[in-house]
Swiss-Prot record:
It comes from Burkholderia lata (strain ATCC 17760 / DSM 23089 / LMG 22485 / NCIMB 9086 / R18194 / 383). This is tRNA uridine 5-carboxymethylaminomethyl modification enzyme MnmG. FAD binds at residues 13-18. Signal peptide: none annotated. GO terms for molecular function: flavin adenine dinucleotide binding. Belongs to the MnmG family.
């Protein structure tokens, strides 16, 4: 039957990509339908019970700055919070939280059920409705046809998923859930380039059978307790719990080696490539054969369960080997396994077949987000989901897509890497992937993106008000520190010595003093008995106050580095956003090698910047392209004044 209501956007899948996509589309005013095979698993944390980490936490902050749900849901469900790399520079500091799985799902579902313009429906999708070169809807397993002008597909590991435990395997999207076999077959009919990837998860352990007296406790940060959302408060956090640390040993490694002849990875049963940066314990023992021990973190799954997640022993070994290797580790000698670990193989589609908006090049109105694009991780999925949902909404509103640049957001780095370079293995985000990471910090994600999010219709009044107060206070306080001076006469030598190590010998602005190593904002403001502080409080809210102080201090201390990076961005931007015509035949570009013209015709980059990042495309080839465009008057720059006004300063529109 044809469902009587026609929607603007259909989102298929209710994981981290799908939930953010549905919320973003609905926030923009698009009539949105979220189709999921099981409403009870909306926002399910299928693997580890944690959010954030190096690079990943940056993505979560960016999703939050654009009005997304992941950070706020983590604040409501997080049972341990830590700042990683806290002793290092601000560019690589990252927030990580352990989350209660049940509370996290509840927080996400609450937002979905209370979001205007969003409908939920429980049915697996078996088919897409395609007319010519555009998608027009989706068909469920019982034949209900839902019509829409755009579809966002966020199928996770469900596309033709196959679960492996030892040499046994069966179809499944994850443990306890069916695979999407019919939908996978339908997508293959559409001739979209695809492949197989693999990921895995460890066995789960009953905490009542763990001897914690033999383990090392790892508490969260308490002074201060971190929060994830820019609107978050530590008071929102539920009860906090520690994690625990144990280690593998030589006996563990011998047990694993003895089981490799029954490992699906090492017997060729699994063909998909696994994640390099989240390897199975089999991979670790094989790749790092000289290493005598590996650290294993025992992470609590929640406040109302005894289940623990042993981070570091993801495996697809036979269950008897899993049991033996767990029992070989200190504190786990009598551990009871609640669920076996497993590996899962699934279909993904080459992201080079996508536009930077995450719309497929072959089928208008069809967007992909999450693991279907070859990524791994909740955070990468959520970021893609938000972008795909946003651009699906803009597509039905007949507006240009918004595609963040590499110098603008980690989301921009993520998408640009995917659509220009593709993936040979599951892609995860690291700060090292961003060439402008000093400008792309966690602490300034809102400064970079919230104003754009407001222009796009993603940011509500509450967030906008808090952001505006913070932005204005940072600007005022920075200028005050630059224009407030102390002299040898006005600053007593003993005060100067206590703060700076010696008396000052000439006039300094407070900003110049703050720029010195080891000097803090509070230290500078405390000079002259506190007279160097602001005349009025920067904010009534203590959390907002700390954010303002952090922004001011980082902005002043790293001003020179940030300005140099801004100059570099400006230089590199000269041709970055010059568009390449849709119909160009690169064989006609004089001087291009056969290899380069073949790659350009195959991958169809949208801009000169994307073309330059395709493997094998040389700077000389880019110069020839620029000459060709100028000779024929084909090239045009993205980012007209009209587009910038409509989408927020710094947005890069791309033609649908």
């Amino acid at each position: 039957m044809l469902f009587p209501t026609e929607f603007d956007v259909i989102v298929v899948g209710g994981g981290h990509a799908g939930t953010e996509a549905a919320l973003a589309s609905a926030r923009m005013g698009a009539k949105t339908l979220l189709l999921t095979h099981n409403i009870e698993t909306l926002g399910q944390m299928s693997c580890n019970p944690s959010i954030g980490g190096i690079g990943k936490g940056h993505l979560v902050k960016e999703v939050d700055a654009l009005g997304g749900a992941m950070a706020a849901a983590t604040d409501e469900s997080g049972i341990q919070f830590r700042i990683l790399n806290s002793s290092k520079g601000p560019a690589v500091r990252a927030t990580r939280a352990q989350a209660d799985r049940i509370l996290y799902k509840a927080a996400i579902r609450h937002r979905l059920e209370n979001q205007p313009n969003l409908w939920l429906f429980q049915q697996a999708v078996d088919d897409l409705m395609v007319e010519g070169d555009r998608v027009v809807g989706a068909v469920t397993q019982i034949g209900i046809r839902f019509r829409a002008r755009a579809v966002v597909l966020t199928a996770g590991t469900f596309l033709d998923g196959k679960i492996h435990v030892g040499l046994n395997n069966y179809t499944g999207g994850r443990a306890g859930d069916p695979a999407a076999v019919s939908l996978s077959s339908r997508l293959k009919e559409l001739k979209l380039p695809q492949g197989r990837l693999k990921t895995g998860t460890p066995p789960r352990i009953d905490g009542r059978s763990i001897d914690f007296s033999q383990l090392t406790e790892q508490p969260g940060d308490l002074d201060p307790v971190p929060v994830f959302s820019f609107l978050g408060r530590a008071e929102q956090h539920p009860q906090q719990l520690p994690c625990w640390v144990t280690h593998t040993n030589e006996r563990t490694h011998d047990i694993i080696r003895g089981g490799l002849d029954r490992s699906p990875m090492y017997t060729g049963v699994i063909e998909g490539v696994g994640p390099r940066y989240c390897p199975s314990i089999e991979d670790k023992i094989h790749r790092f054969a000289s290493k005598e021990s590996h650290q294993i973190f025992l992470e609590p799954e929640g406040l109302t369960t005894n289940e623990f997640y042993p981070n570091g022993i993801s495996t697809s070994l036979p269950f008897d080997v899993q049991l033996e290797l767990v029992h070989s580790m200190r504190g786990l000698e009598n551990a009871h396994i609640l669920r076996p670990g497993y590996a899962i193989e699934y279909d993904y589609f080459d992201p080079r077949a996508l536009k930077a908006s995450l719309e497929t090049k072959a089928i208008n109105g069809l967007f992909f987000a999450g693991q279907i694009n070859g990524t791994t991780g909740y955070e990468e999925a959520a970021a893609q989901g938000l972008l795909a949902g946003l651009n699906a909404g803009r597509y039905v509103q007949e507006k240009d897509a918004w595609c963040p640049r590499r110098d603008q957001a980690y989301l921009g780095v993520l998408v640009d890497d995917l659509v220009t370079r593709g993936v040979a293995e599951p892609y995860r985000m690291f700060t090292s992937r961003a060439e402008y990471r000093l400008s792309l910090r966690e602490d300034n994600a809102d400064m970079r993106l919230t104003e754009i999010g407001r222009e796009l219709g993603l940011v509500d009044d509450t967030r906008w008000d808090a952001f505006s107060r913070k932005r204005d206070a940072v600007s005022r306080e920075t200028e005050r520190l630059k224009s407030t001076w102390v002299t040898p006469k006005t600053l007593p030598p003993e005060e100067a010595t206590a703060l700076l190590g010696k008396a000052i010998d000439h006039e300094y602005s407070l900003a110049e003093l703050l720029r010195r190593p080891g000097i803090s904002y509070d230290g500078v403001c405390g000079l002259k008995g506190g007279e160097c502080g602001p005349a009025e409080p920067l904010a009534d809210d203590p959390v907002l106050l700390e954010q303002i102080k952090e922004q001011v201090e980082i902005g002043i201390k790293y001003q020179g580095y940030i300005e140099r990076q801004a100059s570099e961005i400006e230089r590199n931007d000269a041709n970055e956003n010059t568009r390449l015509p849709d119909g160009i035949d690169y064989r006609e570009v004089r001087g291009l090698s056969f290899e380069v013209s073949q790659k350009l015709n195959e991958f169809r980059p949208e801009t000169i910047g994307q073309a330059s990042r395709i493997s094998g495309v040389t700077p000389a080839a880019i110069s020839l392209l620029m000459v060709h465009l100028k000779r024929r008057g084909l090239g045009r720059r993205n980012g007209t004044a009209e587009a910038a006004t409509e989408q927020g300063d710094g947005a890069v529109p791309t033609q649908q």
